[in-house]
Amino acid sequence: TLCSESSPLMSTHSWRDALKIYSSPASIALLLLGFAAGLPYMLVFSTLSVWLRESGVDLKTIAFASLIGLTYAFKWVWSPLLDQWRLPILGRLGRRRSWLVLSQSLVAIGLAGMALCDPQESLSVLISLAVLVAFASATQDVAVDAYRLEIAENESQAALAATYMAGYRIAALFAIAGALYFADWFGA
């Protein structure tokens, strides 16, 4: 039967084993990397559209800007390059870490630049920065997946994927709720 002791569906791990896996340094790192990947995703997809609408940008332009999200759908196109190219300066950190550092740096620069833009005055700059953020974030997503596969044994992969997704979802909530909070705070 499905619930017999010999069933492959029955777990042989205790709560202590689960706690050990989910509190490991690798799990905590993946939780933080998930947060770092989820935040720009939601900012580019949801929050940007709301911001543009609140700024009076026409709906056709907002619809066009939503195409930025396609970078996440097509990340498979450039993902093999992350395996092939070794970054010149950051390469000493290792292949995965160097791509993580580069992509996170580009995300931070892009988000900071977006925060300084006024959609009414510099819409093209804002959209260009959003494309940069989306591309760097999608690249970061690829690098994190490869990093996760390299740092852990097979039996830990499910826990690491779960902590990554938990961080991703927490970031999504933070991006949406945080945007609403700051909009209220600044009276936008």
At which residue positions do the language-model features occur?
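Loop-to-transmembrane helix entry/capping segments in MFS-fold secondary transporters
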Residues: 59, 154-163
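Hydrophobic core of transmembrane alpha-helices in multi-pass small-molecule transporters
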Residues: 35, 110-113, 121-140
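Glycine-rich segments within core transmembrane alpha-helices of 12-TM secondary carriers
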Residues: 75, 159-179
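Helix-loop boundary and gating motifs at the non-cytosolic
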Residues: 13-72
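Cytoplasmic membrane-interface "Motif A"-like loop-to-helix N-cap segments
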Residues: 84-104
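Intracellular juxtamembrane helix-capping segments at the cytosolic ends
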Residues: 139-152
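Transmembrane alpha-helix termini and helix-breaking/packing motifs in multi-pass membrane transporters
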Residues: 83-84, 115, 174-188
